């Protein structure tokens, strides 16, 4: 597994993208809002700057991490050739079901689909897909580390 897509560039999404990128995964960060993507990348860079200041990473590590994240406003492009999708959209059941229906249409049958939901049934989310056995819950706590 090398390519990961994160859906949603808010607090959780940018933290998840940062964490995967820092661990050398290629990360596509998808959001319908270009402004949200810009804010997410700024937040990630600010967090990396703090890590450089604390000497927990080097500037080279920061640059490498940022180079691993590619922003997309188009979900179709953002999920191409991905091994894992982590959905971190707003905690809204209708929205999440809509996203998973779309992911089911767009992703390869071997792509793992994960939701960061804290309250919605994974079984319910999986039920809108044709690959129920590849839908999982992957709940991250804030801050993501």
Give residue ranges: language-model regions.
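Structural motif
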Residues: 7, 30, 72, 88, ...
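Rossmann-fold dinucleotide-binding core
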Residues: 112-145
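NAD(P)+-binding Rossmann beta1-loop-alpha1 motif at the extreme N-terminus of oxidoreductases
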Residues: 1-47, 54
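Acidic/polar active-site rim loop that often engages polyanionic ligands
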Residues: 25, 80, 143-145
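Conserved beta-strand segments of alpha/beta enzyme cores
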Residues: 26, 68-70, 134
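Rossmann-like NAD(P)-binding element
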Residues: 50-112, 120
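Hydrophobic packing residues within well-ordered alpha-helices of enzyme cores
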Residues: 40, 99, 103, 125-126
């Amino acid at each position: 597994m090398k390519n990961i897509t994160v859906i949603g560039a808010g607090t959780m999404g940018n933290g998840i993208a940062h964490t995967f990128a820092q661990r050398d995964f290629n990360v596509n960060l998808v959001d319908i809002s270009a402004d949200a993507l810009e804010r997410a990348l700024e937040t990630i860079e600010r967090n990396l700057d703090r890590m450089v200041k604390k000497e927990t990473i080097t500037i080279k590590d920061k640059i490498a991490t940022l180079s691993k994240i590619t922003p997309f406003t188009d979900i179709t492009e953002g999920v191409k050739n991905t091994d894992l999708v982590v959905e971190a959209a707003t905690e809204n059941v209708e929205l999440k079901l809509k996203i998973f229906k779309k992911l089911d249409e767009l992703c390869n049958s071997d792509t793992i689909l994960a939701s960061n939901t804290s309250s919605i049934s994974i079984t319910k989310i999986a039920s809108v897909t044709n690959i129920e056995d590849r839908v999982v819950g992957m709940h991250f706590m804030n801050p993501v580390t």
